[in-house]
Amino acid sequence: STYGISQQLLMVGLVLILFALAFKMSAVPFHFWTPDVYTGAPTVITAFMATIVKIGAIVGFYRLFSVVISFYTTYNIILLVISTLTIVLGNVIAATQSNTKRMLAYSSIGHAGFIILGITVLSPSTTYVTWYYLLAYTLSSLAAFWVFYLVSEQAEQEEEISIFKGLVK
């Protein structure tokens, strides 16, 4: 018993917090909402969700689990499985999409897996690399959504990936 809280109750609380943060980061198996919401929301809101909301969840995840992982190695194994599944599923499904926003959504899921993996390993060098990766992900996502917004304003089929044909000539 720590501070009058049983060990089992503490574990249940940590699992529930993990689930909530995994949902906000769009990690497998809590990723199902992301493609539908990204597709249905205006591009500016989608860019906000893909960057700012995800950063908030990742910072919360890091703050909590940088302490917890050192005490509970079971969480480390669970997070390695979650991050691996998130990377594979996000990137494989992203490669099959014809809708640009859905592709960006699944790509965002894959990137979340890489970030979770960096936090899970949690050594001093991976911490810096993870924050650098998060910065690079944020800037590239903002650029991708900005280009999508500019191109889709001129296109008839505004969300299909075919609108980018001839963009680099």
Language-model-derived ranges and their functions:
Residues 1-169:
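Alpha-helical transmembrane segments of multi-pass membrane proteins predominantly involved
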